[in-house]
């Protein structure tokens, strides 16, 4: 080999700086609507579609399929909707995910509350549509797809623990697959969907494997079922907080971590 070669590290630095400049230019070129309104509209739309499909899969679930039908419906629907709409809003459709993504720097803090509002309204719309298209008897037999599995105080600790752990897996899949630069990749929507399938199959019999306050809230409003509803807020939001701190402190890339930096 002849001639001088550009050092690889210098080349990489220039490429990285160029990418950062292009991303910044692209972001600043976006309109106010595209930065602040459009993502909230997409979060509302995506949440409505996801929760509509999820609720129907529970209401119309055959006893012979057990957890398989809702697990596949929730996971495949979420992966599909993220792949379709994720480039606009990030594809959260879940207040716990939005909390974690905000903590790791993937979402502007000022957008967190608007995202939550959009997701909750989307949840109500999706649950309302499911109620409209479902036979009344099946709807009420399934408690409107609300989470009614916890019936006794003795079940609370187990259900809360399952919600925390299962939601942590989902939120890790989102943050590491779609936000953290070192580990993000094009298969993130599928890994996120798979995490939902796995979570429901594993924990559905204990807590219902909600992992999403919006998924719990919409059906609860439509069915008027609020027993132990707080579990499906506290568990997922604690999980989002834990994962955000875990990534910020230990497993995030150099740009994301707050401690243990190389320089």
Swiss-Prot record:
Membrane topology label: Multi-pass membrane protein
Cysteine persulfide modification sites are 55
Quote the PTM field: N-glycosylated. Sulfenylation at Cys-55(C55-SOH) when hydrogen peroxide flows through the AQP8 channel, making it susceptible to hydrogen sulfide produced by CBS.
InterPro entries recorded: Aquaporin-like, Aquaporin_8, Aquaporin_transptr, MIP, MIP_CS
Which branch of life, at top level? Eukaryota
Enumerate the catalysed reactions: H2O(in) = H2O(out); NH4(+)(in) = NH4(+)(out); H2O2(out) = H2O2(in); formamide(out) = formamide(in)
Location relative to the cell: Cell membrane; Mitochondrion inner membrane; Apical cell membrane; Basolateral cell membrane
Major subcellular site: membrane
Give the matching PROSITE patterns. MIP
Q: Which residues cross the membrane?
A: 39-59, 87-107, 110-130, 159-179, 186-206, 231-251
**Molecular function via GO:** ammonium channel activity; methylammonium channel activity; urea channel activity; water channel activity
Q: Which UniProt keywords apply?
A: Cell membrane, Endoplasmic reticulum, Glycoprotein, Membrane, Mitochondrion, Mitochondrion inner membrane, Oxidation, Repeat, Transmembrane, Transmembrane helix, Transport
Which ranges of this chain reside in the Cytoplasmic compartment per its record? 1-38, 108-109, 180-185, 252-263
Q: What induces it?
A: Up-regulated by glucagon.
Per the record, GO CC terms? Answer: apical part of cell; apical plasma membrane; basolateral plasma membrane; brush border membrane; intracellular canaliculus; intracellular vesicle; mitochondrial inner membrane; mitochondrial membrane
Question: Which residues, renumbered to this chain, carry the PTM Cysteine sulfenic acid (-SOH)?
Answer: 55
Extracellular topological domain residue ranges: 60-86, 131-158, 207-230
Q: Does the keyword Transmembrane helix apply?
A: yes
SUPFAM superfamilies given in the database record: Aquaporin-like
**What is one process in the GO biological process aspect for this record?**
cellular detoxification
Q: So what does this one do?
A: Channel that allows the facilitated permeation of water and uncharged molecules, such as hydrogen peroxide and the neutral form of ammonia (NH3), through cellular membranes such as plasma membrane, inner mitochondrial membrane and endoplasmic reticulum membrane of several tissues. The transport of ammonia neutral form induces a parallel transport of proton, at alkaline pH when the concentration of ammonia is high. However, it is unclear whether the transport of proton takes place via the aquaporin or via an endogenous pathway.
The record comments on the domains as follows: Aquaporins contain two tandem repeats each containing three membrane-spanning domains and a pore-forming loop with the signature motif Asn-Pro-Ala (NPA).
Protein name (database record): Aquaporin-8
Origin organism is Rattus norvegicus
